[in-house]
């Protein structure tokens, strides 16, 4: 006859089995994701950095997430957010007009070039920088703030000790291997993007404006967005530079799930290498599987 003591012991073991199984399953899933990212990186011939934050429980998926990568145009999010922060204490700031001269134009100016010998508001510059990756718009935002170091100072005010902006467009895109200028890590950028878009780093009106700009991005259809179900809502900012550097940072709203924050950075050993947005799409598909 089974004694009460033995019965209690068996019930205790049986009760813990689902937990043990769950832990083992999660561990196996995590290993599988890491292995898939490693295989993707190996097949690409480059270096891949990924950081995903699941805001439902703040769990993370990380791959080379503490290594530095050139940000390229993903740094535009920080510059635009810094201007939005200023507008919290000056409700008319975003309507301030900035002169656009022909001499201001650099290598990519799809919006600013239409306003040469005219003006754009800071709000229009923010939209141009984030939704069209307009480099002149980025430079105007940086100039308004007082230089690249002021963008870095804004990051520090948010508790981001990793982000650093040293140059303006287009030189911030040189992405030279080992060069710390204009770099961050995937994890640092993911944490800051979360704070800016889903947290308290900006007041509600400014936060909503940043999210609206990101959701309206026109340059990301082949990057993170391409690896996600079409029904998911995405706000992102892409970036690219020398050494085939190909980046995308995103806030993602899956169906029936809390938002995800995903940073994908990729770079290659050859200066003239082609961009690889397909690598970012593949990484996004790997890390969001199951959500």
Swiss-Prot record:
GO terms for cellular component: extracellular region. Monomer. Keywords: Antibiotic resistance, Hydrolase, Plasmid, Secreted, Signal. One of its GO terms (molecular function) is beta-lactamase activity. The active site is at residue 73. A beta-lactam binds at residues 76, 133, 169, 240. It is found in: Secreted. PROSITE patterns: BETA_LACTAMASE_A. Belongs to the class-A beta-lactamase family. InterPro entries: Beta-lactam/transpept-like, Beta-lactam_cat, Beta-lactam_class-A, Beta-lactam_class-A_AS. It catalyses: a beta-lactam + H2O = a substituted beta-amino acid. Its main location: secreted. NCBIfam families: bla_class_A, blaCTX-M. This is Beta-lactamase CTX-M-2. Its EC number is 3.5.2.6. The lineage of its organism: Bacteria, Pseudomonadati, Pseudomonadota, Gammaproteobacteria, Enterobacterales. The keyword Signal applies. One of its GO terms (biological process) is beta-lactam antibiotic catabolic process. Has cefotaxime-hydrolyzing activity.
């Amino acid at each position: 006859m089974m004694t009460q003591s033995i019965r209690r012991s068996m019930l205790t073991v049986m009760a813990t089995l689902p937990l043990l199984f769950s832990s083992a399953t999660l561990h196996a899933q995590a290993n599988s994701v890491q292995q898939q990212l490693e295989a993707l990186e190996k097949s690409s011939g480059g270096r891949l950095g990924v950081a995903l934050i699941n805001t439902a429980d703040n769990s993370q998926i990380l791959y080379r997430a503490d290594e530095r990568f050139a940000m390229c145009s993903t740094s535009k999010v920080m510059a635009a957010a810094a201007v939005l922060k200023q507008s919290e204490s000056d409700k008319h700031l975003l309507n301030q007009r900035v002169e656009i001269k022909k001499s201001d134009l650099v290598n990519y100016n799809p919006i600013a070039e239409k306003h040469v010998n005219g003006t754009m508001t800071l709000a229009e510059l923010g939209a141009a920088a984030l939704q069209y990756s307009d480099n002149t718009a980025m430079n105007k935002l940086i100039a308004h703030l007082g230089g690249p170091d002021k963008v870095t100072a804004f990051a520090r005010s948010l508790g981001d000790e990793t982000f650093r902006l040293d140059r303006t467009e287009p030189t911030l895109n040189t992405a030279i291997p080992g060069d710390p200028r204009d770099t961050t890590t995937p994890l640092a950028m993911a944490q800051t993007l979360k704070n800016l878009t889903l947290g308290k780093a900006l007041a509600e009106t400014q936060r909503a404006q940043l999210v609206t700009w990101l959701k309206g991005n026109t340059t990301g259809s082949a990057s993170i967005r391409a690896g996600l179900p079409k029904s998911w809502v995405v706000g992102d900012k892409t970036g690219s530079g020398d050494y085939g550097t190909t980046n995308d940072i995103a806030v993602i709203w899956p169906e029936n799930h809390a938002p995800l924050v995903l940073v994908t950075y990729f770079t290659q050993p050859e200066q003239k290498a082609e961009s690889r947005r397909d690598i970012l799409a593949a990484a996004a598909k790997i890390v969001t599987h199951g959500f």
